[in-house]
UniProtKB/Swiss-Prot annotation:
Belongs to the UPF0251 family. This is UPF0251 protein CT1277. Residues 157-171 have a biased composition (Basic and acidic residues). Residues 172-184 have a biased composition (Gly residues). Residues 138-197 are annotated as: Disordered. Pfam families: DUF134 (PF02001).
Length: 197
């Protein structure tokens, strides 16, 4: 029986998760899957230029394990480029090692950060609005995550978007996620009684 896989620390979720040739006819179900830890290994070794020993220390794994992850990631990149396959970045037994969470206020635009381990703020420190959200690394709303515990494990696409809803009848909708949300809105009294508005 193999040993359980140890959590791998990554700095942040990748901003882009789907890669491939720009042509019609490529199906996403035939795509290669690169885990978050493989993506992080490519980032540390090839983009940041770190030696494997230092990169392994940052991911909190052994140098040998880092080398295996890096070799697997490079093989998938090669297949994507040479064979023209799609590549999806998702899954893996990971934990986010980013030291601070970034929050933003939708009312006044104020941004601030708090270290992990401190409770989520209830209101904006600038304007006291309760319309606050986690910010993604790129600066937009939607950096929140589900899951609990130290390792998040096999995540894919769990970031929540800002939400845009359209209410029924005349009223304001409240959306969940990207696109049209599940807004309910408020009906005017005349409509509730069957009259015209």
């Amino acid at each position: 029986m193999p040993r359980p896989q140890k959590c791998r620390a990554i700095a942040q979720d990748p901003e882009y998760r789907v890669f491939g040739p720009f042509c019609v006819g490529k199906r996403e179900d035939e795509a290669l899957v690169m885990s978050f830890d493989e993506f992080e290994a490519i980032r540390l070794a090839d983009v940041e230029g770190l030696y494997q020993e230092e990169a392994a220390r940052q991911m909190q794994i052994s140098r040998q394990t880092f080398g295996n992850i890096l070799a697997s990631a490079r093989k998938k990149l090669g297949e994507m480029l040479v064979l023209g396959k799609m590549l999806n970045v998702k899954g893996g037994n990971i934990m986010i090692s980013q030291e601070e969470r970034i929050f933003g206020c939708a009312a006044c635009g104020h941004q601030w950060s708090l270290p992990y381990g401190i409770a989520r703020p209830v209101e904006c420190p600038s304007c006291s609005s309760q319309n606050i959200h986690r910010m993604s690394p790129g600066g937009g709303f939607g950096g929140g995550r589900r899951g609990g515990g130290k390792c998040r494990g096999f995540r894919s696409g769990l970031d929540r978007g800002p939400g845009h809803g359209e209410g029924r009848c005349q009223g304001e909708g409240h959306g969940n996620g990207n696109g049209n949300g599940n807004g309910q809105g408020r009906m005017r009294r005349n409509q509730q009684e069957g009259g015209e508005v």
